[in-house]
Amino acid sequence: MFEREEQPDLCRSAKAGLIEYRTVQLLHREGIAPSILDFAVENHRCEFRTPDESVVLEYAALTGGRPHYIYPQHQLVRRLCETLTNAGGHIRFGHTVHAVRQDHGGVVLSMDGPGGDRTEIECDVAVGCEGSSSPVARAMTGIRVSEQTLPVRWLVFLGAAPPLVNHTIYAAHPRGSAQQLRRGPDKTRYYLEIPITDTTADWPEQRVRQELAARLGAGGRLDDVPLVEFGLLDMRVRVTEPMQQDRLFLAGDAAHLITPAGGKGMNLAIQDAVELAHGLIEHFGPKHEDQRLLAYSQTRLPHIWRAQAFSNWLLHLITSLQDGREPADAAPGAGR
């Protein structure tokens, strides 16, 4: 495994943090969750707020006791890295792959190491899991990329304090949406919808506090909460079809990009990885069977399109994109 970031940076960058019930069940079936993961913090409900009313959706109760689990992505990545290396696996941190080519029945990766030394690695297959700029994706020909940029921008930041309530809040407001997402007992992720042309410079901390409190209906409860790690998030969606070509494969953000609405991205990536791992094991293991590996794209794409449609529907519901109607084109290819 080659990772472009150094391990300390990779394992402290706070990103996603909501893991679906079915993803946890999948990790349990794979024998991963019991040994390294403690899914003790659960999220059973979400709340939709407007200036006039509030509706709490008890989705766990409505689905037979199936909650989400709060597990910050950087902590999950750190535990998975530790487990892999403890089992004898190798991760080369600080290695940037800049070119990929298929050659003589294999794959050649050209990369730069931590010291800037360029080297080439030959392998049987290559799996690109490195995001939208994936060199593995660039090396694939004849693929179709469906993508869309939505006119929505979120200001993203962390609050170094417990959440207002112990569940997710989606607030729809005439000036834009706001969201509260739990990230642990003393950290909370906030999203604040801002004009598409604004930057962080347009939003000093006092303005952020006032607007967040107004949209969430928080009164003065956020006045003394330290706010850190500010950033911008534009809403882009993308799906690559197929997710494989010969000895090249894509998983996670290298294959598809989804809006943060609904917390689907990390879950899709985990589900991709498990399905692809099974295909590779059956191909290279004692079975020497190719059926599952060849069907990887066909297996995963329906789930990806369905998640895209849901995420974009939710985005339209809570943001300024909402116009009172369910969007007919909530996601590229949503009618599939």
Stretches with model-predicted labels:
Residues 260-272:
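A conserved FAD-binding loop/helix module that cradles the flavin
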Residues 82, 99, 104-108, 112-119, ...:
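Conserved FAD-binding catalytic core of PHBH/FMO-like flavoproteins
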Residues 1-15:
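Glycine-rich FAD pyrophosphate-binding loop
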Residues 234-256:
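FAD-binding beta-loop-beta segment adjacent to the flavin cofactor pocket
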Residues 263, 278-336:
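C-terminal helical "tail/cap" subdomain of flavin- and related membrane-associated enzymes
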Residues 90-92:
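General small-molecule cofactor/ligand-binding pocket signal
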